[in-house]
From Swiss-Prot:
Residue stretches of biased makeup (Pro residues): 221-234, 241-317
Post-translational modification: Intersubunit cross-links are formed between saccharide chains rather than between polypeptide chains. Hydroxylated on proline residues in the Pro-rich central domain.
Keyword Nucleotidyltransferase among UniProt keywords: no
Record's keyword annotation contains Signal: yes
Sugar-bearing residue positions: 193, 347
Segments of this protein annotated with the region Disordered: 212-317
Protein name per the record: Sulfated surface glycoprotein 185
InterPro entries given in the database record: Pherophorin (IPR024616)
Reported function: The extracellular matrix (ECM) of Volvox contains insoluble fibrous layers that surround individual cells at a distance to form contiguous cellular compartments. SSG 185 is the monomeric precursor of this substructure (C3Z structure).
Signal peptide stretch: 1-20
UniProt KW keywords: Glycoprotein, Hydroxylation, Signal
Length: 485
């Protein structure tokens, strides 16, 4: 009887284990999400500095076995990671390879139907055969995350770390096809340059180094962190302090012009002498002349000078929500001449999110060449600094309508944004972009969906959102750098 109970118990455990695996692969219901709205939509070690796995962009492979392919290469690179010392103490430094996931547009289902792993390879390493294989794949919605979908490659991909390492330096090729007439790759990956957001998982699914790969992105991102130092001399060499003078714009000097009129009043006193022509009685009249002096007090009546405050009224037309005082923080320098980072609108496209209309907004974040050439390091010393944060003075009614963002051309994906608790300010934080990455330029993309707002014009009405940029690490410089609409 006890044996029967044990058999039943083991059977139940097997069923539960199988169900758990299915849930992990499809809906990830068993994974505790720290941020359920952020790719890769699960709790795992996603920082690239803790794993050597990278997905390097290779390019197109046309008409191979009846398909046109876009190919990448799985490589191991420890540059800028904690995986450079032996023995390896970090568990993700020597993790096995299990699957790759891409963050894709839900409405592009049917765009990718095949995945090819290990193209052109047939080799046995340590008793493990590595062989080209083509399998069927598809795009799956992410449970509980509206407007999110995943393209997953699992079949025939699993390999031990030692086998993956034996294919250095070229790595292991992985390709996906594209069905003619479907979404383009920029549409599929929701990036104008076709940059893909990816995660590489181990079999325990607790390691998921996450990054970007595309024609304009070097997936081995941590290394450039030291590169911003060289550019620093360039901006300082051509610094142009004159930029600060424009900032003072006190029109107050005009009021003094009224002061000259007071001198003319003194001439009136000469007329009083004619009255003295009469006999002694006139002397008493001279006291009346003192009343004329009262006109002189009129000059002190500069209280009319308060008229100068009238100039402030023109400021309101700057933008629908007045951005007076923005950004609301203390910085060493607020001058755009001290910090060359700029933000512009790259593109805005219509999207459907959970059956409702919305828009995807991509902002170009970069170091402006002209601003860098004339940057004045004497105003705060931020000319060669990286970018930590971007703030938008926006429509506060859009709180709850912004979905997490993706950031291209960086070593990691970050999706940290928030609204100020008391003011209508949308903040994109923890960007961690280096100066060198700013020179290359990057895209910050996010979705806008109801209920409060569904369009970029809702978020940035009128003349648009006023933008402020902050250097890292201590927000020394925080200039306003224009508006976007």
């Amino acid at each position: 009887m006890s044996k029967l109970l044990l058999v039943a118990l083991f059977g139940a455990i097997a069923v539960v284990a199988t169900s758990a695996e299915v849930l992990n692969l499809n809906g990830r219901s068993l994974l505790n999400n720290d941020d359920p709205n952020a790719f890769p939509y699960c709790k795992c070690t996603y920082r690239q500095r803790r794993s050597p796995y990278r997905l390097k962009y290779v390019g197109a492979e046309n008409n191979y076995k009846g398909n046109d392919w876009l190919c990448y290469s799985i490589v191991l690179d420890t540059t800028g990671t904690v995986c450079q010392t032996v023995p390896l103490t970090e568990p993700c430094c020597s993790a096995d390879l299990y699957k790759i996931e891409f963050d894709v547009k839900p409405s592009c289902k049917g765009t990718v139907t095949r995945a090819m792993v290990f193209k052109g390879i047939d080799r046995t390493v340590g008793g493990v055969r590595v062989l080209e294989s083509i399998s069927t794949v598809g795009i799956d919605d992410v449970t509980g995350v509206p407007g999110a979908a995943i393209l997953r490659i699992v079949k025939d991909l699993a390999l031990p770390y030692s086998v993956v390492a034996s294919f250095l330096p070229n790595g292991l090729p992985v390709c996906i096809n594209r069905v003619p007439g479907s979404c383009t790759f920029p549409e599929l990956f929701m990036d104008v340059n076709g940059t893909a957001s990816y995660s590489v998982f181990n079999s325990d699914k607790d390691c998921c180094p996450t990054g970007l790969s595309g024609p304009n992105v070097n997936p081995i991102g941590p290394a450039p962190n030291n590169s911003p130092l060289p550019p620093s001399p360039q901006p300082t060499a051509s610094s142009r302090p004159p930029s600060p003078p424009p900032s003072p714009r006190p029109p107050s000097p005009p009021p003094p012009s009224p002061s000259p009129p007071p001198p003319p009043p003194p001439p009136p006193p000469p007329p009083p002498p004619p009255p003295p022509s009469p006999p002694p009685p006139p002397p008493p009249p001279p006291p009346p002349p003192p009343p004329p002096p009262p006109p002189s007090p009129s000059p002190p009546r500069k209280p009319p000078s308060p008229s100068p405050p009238v100039p402030p009224p023109p400021s309101p037309p700057s933008v629908l929500p007045a951005a007076t005082g923005f950004p609301f923080c203390e910085c060493v320098s607020r001058s755009p001449s001290s910090y060359p980072w700029r933000v512009t609108v790259a593109n805005v496209s219509a999207v459907t999110i959970s059956g409702g209309a919305g828009e995807r907004v991509c902002l170009k974040i970069s170091v402006d060449n002209a601003a860098a050439a004339t940057c004045n390091n004497g105003l705060g010393g931020c000319c060669s600094d990286g970018l930590e944060k971007v703030e938008l003075f926006a429509n506060g009614k859009c709180k709850g309508s912004i979905l997490p963002f993706t950031l291209s051309n960086t070593a990691e994906i970050r999706s940290s944004f928030s609204w100020d608790s008391t003011r209508p300010v949308l903040k994109f934080t923890r960007l961690g972009l280096t100066y060198a990455q700013g020179v290359a330029g990057g895209s910050l993309c996010f979705n806008i969906k109801g209920a409060g707002c569904t369009k970029f014009a809702d978020l940035c009405p009128g003349r648009g959102c006023t933008v402020a940029v902050f250097n890292n690490p201590d927000n020394t410089c925080c200039p306003r750098v224009g508006t976007i609409a």
